C-alpha cells in the first residue's frame, strides 16, 4: 500500500545517506592520511632529494583531495537541483580529442594505446563545456585504472544524438559489475581498497550527461568494457 511504499522509500533514502557518509569518510581519509604521514617524514629528514619526493606526494594528495571535494560539491548541487547547465554548441569530437591528448603522458606511463576511429559525421552537439570536460576526465581516469593496454574511441550518429563510445579490454582479475558502475561510491574493487578511485566519478558523470539532455550507459561484452555518452546533435 501507499504507506508501505513511503516507508520503503524512506529506508532507501536513509541507506543512501549512510553509504554516502561512509564513502565520503573513506575517500577523504585516504589522501589526508598520506598528507599527514609525509608531513611527519618531512620533519624528520634533511636529505634534499627525499624532501622533494615527499613534497611531490603531498601536492598530489592535495590535488586529489581538491578534485574529490569538487566532485562532491557538484554532486550535491545536482541532487538538490541547484546546478544549471550552461549549454553551448560545440564539436564533440574536437573536445574529446583535446582532453584525451592532454592525458598523453599518463597513457604512456600505463602503456595504454588510444586509437581514434575515423569518422565523417558532423559531431556538433549541445553541451556545457566545463561539465563535458568533467565527464571526459572521469572516463579517462576509469581507463587509466582498468584498461588493459588499449582503448578505442568512436563516434556514431543516432538521431537525435551523437554517440561517443570508449571501449577497452579490462585488466585480468578486475571485478566489474556493469549494473553498478553508475551507482554512488561503487568501485570495481569491491573491497574499496582502491585508493585512487572516489567511486563517484561515473555516477556524477551520468548525472551531468543527463543534465545536458543526454544519456550515459556502460556495457561489458567478452572482456571489453565500453562506456557510451550520447549528446543531442545540433
Locate each region found by the language model:
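Conserved micro-motifs of the catalytic ATP-binding
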Residues: 80-85, 124-127
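Conserved catalytic submotifs in the C-terminal HATPase_c
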Residues: 88-89, 113-123
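Short helix-loop "hinge" at the ATP-lid/N-box region of the Bergerat-fold HATPase_c
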Residues: 142-144
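Short beta-strand/loop element within the Bergerat-fold HATPase_c
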Residues: 150-161
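Short conserved segment of the HATPase_c
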Residues: 173-186
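Short alpha-helical Gxxx[C/S/T] motif in the catalytic ATP-binding
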Residues: 201, 205
Amino acid at each position: 500500500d501507499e504507506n508501505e511504499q513511503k516507508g520503503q522509500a524512506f529506508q532507501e533514502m536513509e541507506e543512501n545517506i549512510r553509504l554516502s557518509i561512509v564513502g565520503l569518510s573513506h575517500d577523504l581519509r585516504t589522501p589526508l592520511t598520506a598528507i599527514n604521514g609525509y608531513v611527519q617524514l618531512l620533519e624528520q629528514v634533511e636529505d634534499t632529494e627525499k624532501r622533494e619526493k615527499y613534497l611531490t606526494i603531498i601536492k598530489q594528495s592535495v590535488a586529489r583531495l581538491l578534485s574529490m571535494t569538487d566532485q562532491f560539491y557538484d554532486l550535491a548541487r545536482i541532487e538538490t537541483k541547484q546546478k544549471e547547465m550552461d549549454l553551448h554548441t560545440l564539436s564533440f569530437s574536437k573536445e574529446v580529442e583535446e582532453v584525451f591528448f592532454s592525458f598523453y603522458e599518463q597513457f604512456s606511463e600505463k602503456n595504454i594505446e588510444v586509437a581514434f576511429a575515423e569518422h565523417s559525421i558532423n559531431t556538433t552537439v549541445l553541451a556545457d563545456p566545463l561539465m563535458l570536460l568533467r565527464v571526459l576526465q572521469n572516463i579517462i581516469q576509469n581507463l587509466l585504472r582498468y584498461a588493459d593496454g588499449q582503448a578505442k574511441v568512436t563516434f556514431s550518429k543516432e538521431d537525435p544524438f551523437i554517440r561517443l563510445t570508449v571501449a577497452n579490454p579490462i585488466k585480468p582479475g578486475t571485478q566489474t559489475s556493469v549494473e553498478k558502475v553508475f551507482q554512488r561510491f561503487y568501485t570495481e574493487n569491491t573491497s574499496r581498497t582502491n585508493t585512487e578511485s572516489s567511486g563517484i566519478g561515473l555516477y556524477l558523470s551520468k548525472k551531468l550527461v543527463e543534465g545536458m539532455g543526454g544519456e550515459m550507459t556502460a556495457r561489458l561484452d567478452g572482456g571489453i568494457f565500453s562506456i557510451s555518452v550520447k549528446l543531442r546533435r545540433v
